[in-house]
Amino acid sequence: MIRQCLSRRAAYPCYRIVAGGTEPTGCLYPQSCRISRRGRDWSSTSRRAIDTQTSGASNGADYVPLRQQLKEQARAKRAAKRKGEVSPPEHEDWELTVGIEIHAQLDTDTKLFSRASAAIDDVPNSNVALFDVALPGSQPLFQPATLIPALRAAIALNCDVQRVSRFDRKHYFYQDQPAGYQITQYYEPYAKNGSIWLGSHDGIAKEDGVGVEIGIKQIQMEQDTAKSQELPSSTYLLDFNRVSRPLIEIITLPQIHSPATAAACVRKIQTILQSVGAVTTGMEMGGLRADVNVSVRKRSEGVGDHQYHGVTGLGQRTEIKNLSSFKAVEDAIIAERDRQIAVLRAGGAIEGETRGWTLGSTETRKLRGKEGEVDYRYMPDPDLGPVIIGYDVLCELKAKLPVLPDALLHNLVQDPKYGLSIDDAKTLIELDDGDRLDYYKDAVDILVTLQKDLSDDFSGGKVVGNWVLHELGGLLTKSNLHWDSERVPAQSLAEIINLLSRNKITGSTAKSLFAMVFDGDKRSIGQIVEDENLLLQSLSREEYIALAEEVMRQNPKMVMEICEKRQLGKIGWLVGQIKRIGDRNRVEAQKAEEILRELILK
């Protein structure tokens, strides 16, 4: 449970986290307060309009359409890939260095410093406590339960969890932060000195070889800002539901030297956070954002003059903010790398600044000068006490931590029960917050039970994977639907595959059955097969020969190409013709191919 105690250093409460439950105390306002969305009084927060001035970019005489720029870039990338190049030749004398700051929304019921709900899909400005909008007299109340998913993340990322951590104020003014400061953990974060291993299967750059380890400087808890929406009239609408939602900021060391590896790092961290239930959603739903710090230096000129997070010898860095996809991370780094190299080659100097990047763009743009520690005026938050984490809590969380993605990947590939390819296993792990992987495992377990009577060793895991990823995935995509494990229950999928593997139905019949269930047929698989008379009535050898000879007679040119030029891939097309002129539900593709090979290649 969570006990309130007095700090030796101040009269405000601190929180001691020990095993057994949670009990929040020390609130100025003992219950969550919501601000009315009605009326025109000074406390209304339904909408806050802020006028801004923007200037449009002008097109010069050398303007090149964006579509043409992207096509030329894609063409150059394909050419480089064909030549086996790992980076453009003109950049070989330049070293790129990247550090990443990842902001992830924690999966919690309440906000970080109030009891207001942390729900993300509610009506705008309906979950707002007094402290969230910095009303006079309101104070933060740390919600200890929000620390649990943060600790899971730190353990999964191999961090040293600090027994004592504290909150600080980071001062700046912007419309999405009404207090004029953000509460974070600058000086004493709750986790330090972590690491993440990226293997070749994670999509790292070729120059990184079989794998690379990236250090994590620290992970800190902090509050999120309001969600803003810009209108064409240079006005912003603000939703304060997001203010004080709990975030963790994961800061990597600047040890990444390739855009592809940077994107792989963000992807891997997201997968790990999702696997341990630390975060709500991933990048695709806005639950995770990344800032990247980019610098370059010329190898032939020795080490650079700058340092970042204790790593020395670097070039001057710039920061690119709010990247919301893995592709955006990679493309923004490429664009900024190319810009910095061009500036340095022209004799210029790189300025430390914050830059932005827009999806589909080919270059970054300056947003503002880069603030430093002095600009933010960091100071300990006088309204919040230290957070003390008990060793027993860490032991309990470690014992209950789910299997991490790398171990899970190894199991899916190496265990004969599953026997998946690395690509299929990775896809299952990353899709739908792990729900599709759970569905796959359920279907495999059911199929194992259905095939206990077979003497051969079970090898249906790969078949189930193909159906889950390709057949079911294709139907979901075609229907523009999100993942739903009840669309085709795992029991139904296993029964279809069982019938197919026992040659009781054909492949085309299996797909038809699957589509019927997907479209809402509530009958059992056995009932559908019986009602629709779908059981395979095998053709005799003589019937297969007759069908094959008819197809060969209709396609003499193709038969000649197969026989004389050994174009064996065309046999599959002839099998399709046998299915067309015969009974599709009775023709077995494997037997039809065997007869064709026997007649053509004899």
From Swiss-Prot:
Q: Which GO terms describe its molecular function?
A: ATP binding; glutaminyl-tRNA synthase (glutamine-hydrolyzing) activity
Q: Which reaction does it catalyse?
A: L-glutamyl-tRNA(Gln) + L-glutamine + ATP + H2O = L-glutaminyl-tRNA(Gln) + L-glutamate + ADP + phosphate + H(+)
Against InterPro entries, the record matches this protein to: Asn/Gln-tRNA_amidoTrfase_suB/E, Asn/Gln-tRNA_Trfase_suB/E_cat, Asn/Gln_amidotransferase, Asn/Gln_tRNA_amidoTrase-B-like, GatB, Gln-tRNA_amidoTrfase_suB_CS, Gln_synth/guanido_kin_cat_dom
Indicate the principal place this protein occupies in or around the cell.
mitochondrion
What family is it from? Belongs to the GatB/GatE family. GatB subfamily.
List, alphabetically, the PANTHER family matched: GLUTAMYL-TRNA GLN AMIDOTRANSFERASE SUBUNIT B MITOCHONDRIAL AND PROKARYOTIC PET112-RELATED, GLUTAMYL-TRNA(GLN) AMIDOTRANSFERASE SUBUNIT B, MITOCHONDRIAL
Q: Can you say what this protein is called?
A: Glutamyl-tRNA(Gln) amidotransferase subunit B, mitochondrial
